[in-house]
Amino acid sequence: DQQRNITSFLQIYEEHFDGLGFDGVFLDKIRYGSFSNGLGGVFSCFCPACMKRYQECGIDVDELKHQMGLVRDGAGGYGEQVLGITAYDKGNYTFAHPVWEKFYRKKAEDIARALKTVTGYFHARGMKVGMDTFAPYLAYFAGQDMKRLAPMADFIKPMMYRITNAPAGMPFETDCLIRETVRCNGTQMGMDARTRARKAFFEVLGCHDTG
């Protein structure tokens, strides 16, 4: 439960850190899971609270699950096409199937709503608020919408880790995105297919893949 977690977090701060004279706080891991957690870490969740949110966001859950199944199987035109992405512009993706935009918009709204409460709490105490986020082209998939977060933060530090082969590192997270979504007959495709998919993905981003 998001609200319960927020309340617990702020209670911990008040019990152990309030009054120590901090000038500000730095918020990290303010996101949903990434593809480094596998497809299951991204294609979730379907608890009652999330089901209600899907309805509020106008998401056809049956169609969403169907499209998720097609990605898992590498069917329905996905295959080497990462989630059927057709365009990228200033941190936002366009997909061949509109359910994905609604799905990721819902995630972004959830993160922003939680952070509005948390950042408001600290700003009311005269404290600065900083945020750690994924690199912009990856942040989208974790529910981090920079345009939504910017008004709440005094500064944002995107993790532009160009050579880090570990979670949050750009090459690592990109490889996980490609590996998990480029599939055929329910299994991950070989290196040649992933290389082609990676090249196509970077072409959509409008940049060169340096490996």
Give a label for each model feature.
Residues 1-155, 159-210:
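Polysaccharide-binding and catalytic clefts of secreted carbohydrate-active enzymes
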